[in-house]
């Protein structure tokens, strides 16, 4: 093959040498003109467009005008040379010259003029020229392409309705043309882009039925698949694919994938009720499908969105049958929250413990530890509470609110476990800030601990300090007044005890057990004195 190419090249070079010899020996005669014409073609095929244009120009100057066909051809080739180097205005000039000679190649000139207008983005001008071409040369082999290019011009002008009309005209006039296959596919695509799915489906079906096995049919089936996925009508597509010519295979795995994809698209568009129906249908059809875990996960999210807690428990449970799946963490978060809010505390504790084991970041681990702490405290599991609080308190980015909560629950658990010193340490830490409810109670508990230890002076000092700094939590401040009266009674200062109780009785507005505490102590002081 390579040898043939070398021989051909040598033959052309010999021919060029002969032509140049002819030019050098002849002056302004027919042979001289023809030699320039042939040299122009050789340069053109070698893509030396500047040289080719020069030879054709020389031929036009030498040709006496008798051979109009060759002259028109030379003008066309000069136009082609300018087109190849994107010199559009010059190209149009020479194509116009060629067309005006009224030779059989005039349709080519017209067609090229139209294409150049398109390259200049003058789509209106291109359409006008194409219409004139079809009118002047109805039998032209370029007529088919002209109608197609007219349709493409309308597409580029965003005039899809006119584009569809042009493509349909092409299908009616030249149904067997390869260009008609492209036009038929374009019609389907334009309807698809307009969102006119039913028209697009019919157009694409015609492509597949009329041109089975073609590239256009393959692409039409691809777009049909996308349309049916968008419409969430996969069963229809399966039936259509199996009925279509061209040996189109649509196996169960692909139907599994497309059914899920269609449902997922509905979910992503925010159409929750429709997505729920579609995802449930997918799970019913493919209970062990490739995307069953994804479907259960999205149904969990829909359940959360719709506050359908039974739905969350059902689908999170299905997900946790495969504990190492990528959705397990989020499923546990949703599941544990529902269980906790429904006061299924032991179940919530188990879920939070699983979440802690699986947590892949600090935030989720902290969420799990917080859940474990709260569940353990509600279950009165002091040992679990102490461990959970201790784990939480070593977290590096713990918020002040969670830190206070952990210290408080641990202090309560230590108290229950008769670990008074450890409880007191946590209460003292909390008591540094009495603006929050935990600190307000803790300040009181520190004083109560001192009172219980009969350290009355220290208890009095603690309580007076509390009264001085105050707190927005009136109940614990009132309890501190009551405890201070107990301290004074224990140290023989019954008058002071009575004054604090009476003052509290007059000023405290709460509707709780403080009133009964005051009454019982005043009665006791009255009885003893």
Give a label for each model feature:
Residues 1-529:
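Acidic, polar-rich low-complexity tracts and alpha-helical solenoid repeat scaffolds
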């Amino acid at each position: 093959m390579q040898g043939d190419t070398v021989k051909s090249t040598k033959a052309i070079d010999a021919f060029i040498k002969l032509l140049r010899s002819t030019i050098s020996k002849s002056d302004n005669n027919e042979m001289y003109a023809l030699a320039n014409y042939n040299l122009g073609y050789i340069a053109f095929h070698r893509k030396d467009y500047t040289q080719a244009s020069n030879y054709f120009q020389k031929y036009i100057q030498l040709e006496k005008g008798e051979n109009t066909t060759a002259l028109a051809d030379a003008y066309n080739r000069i136009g082609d040379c300018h087109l190849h180097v994107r010199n559009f205005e010059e190209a149009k000039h020479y194509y116009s010259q060629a067309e005006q000679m009224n030779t059989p190649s005039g349709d080519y000139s017209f067609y090229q003029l139209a294409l150049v207008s398109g390259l200049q983005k003058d789509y209106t001008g291109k359409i006008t020229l194409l219409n004139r071409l079809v009118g002047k040369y109805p039998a032209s082999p370029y007529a088919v392409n002209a109608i197609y290019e007219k349709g493409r011009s309308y597409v580029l002008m965003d005039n899809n309705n006119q584009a569809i009309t042009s493509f349909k005209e092409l299908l009616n006039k030249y149904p067997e043309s390869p260009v008609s296959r492209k036009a038929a596919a374009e019609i389907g695509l334009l309807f698809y882009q307009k969102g006119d799915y039913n028209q697009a489906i019919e157009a694409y079906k015609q492509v597949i039925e009329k041109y089975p096995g073609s590239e256009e049919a393959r692409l039409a089936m691809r777009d049909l698949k996308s349309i049916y996925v968008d419409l969430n009508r996969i069963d229809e597509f399966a039936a259509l694919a199996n009925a279509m010519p061209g040996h189109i295979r649509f196996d169960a795995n692909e139907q599994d994938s497309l059914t899920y994809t269609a449902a997922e698209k509905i979910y992503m568009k925010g159409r929750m009720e429709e997505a729920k129906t579609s995802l449930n249908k997918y799970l019913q059809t493919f209970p062990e499908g490739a995307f069953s875990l994804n479907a259960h996960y999205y149904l969990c999210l829909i359940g959360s969105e719709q506050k359908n807690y039974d739905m969350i428990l059902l689908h999170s449970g299905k997900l946790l049958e495969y504990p190492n799946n990528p959705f397990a963490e989020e499923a546990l978060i949703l599941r544990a929250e529902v269980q906790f809010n429904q006061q299924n505390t032991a179940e919530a504790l188990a879920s939070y413990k699983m979440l802690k084991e699986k947590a892949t970041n600090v935030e989720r681990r902290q969420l799990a530890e917080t859940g474990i702490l709260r569940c353990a405290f509600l279950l009165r599991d002091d040992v679990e509470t102490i461990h959970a609080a201790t784990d939480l308190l070593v977290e590096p980015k713990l918020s002040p609110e969670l830190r206070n909560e952990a210290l408080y629950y641990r202090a309560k658990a230590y108290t229950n476990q008769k670990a008074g010193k450890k409880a007191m340490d946590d209460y003292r830490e909390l008591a540094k800030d009495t603006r929050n409810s935990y600190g307000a109670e803790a300040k009181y508990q520190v004083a109560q601990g001192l009172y219980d230890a009969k350290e009355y002076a220290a208890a009095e000092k603690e309580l007076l300090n509390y009264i001085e700094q105050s707190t927005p939590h009136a109940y614990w401040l009132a309890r501190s007044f009551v405890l201070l009266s107990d301290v004074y009674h224990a140290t023989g200062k019954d008058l002071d005890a009575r004054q604090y109780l009476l003052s509290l009785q007059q000023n405290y507005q709460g509707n709780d057990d403080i009133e009964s505490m005051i009454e019982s102590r005043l009665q006791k002081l009255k009885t003893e004195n």
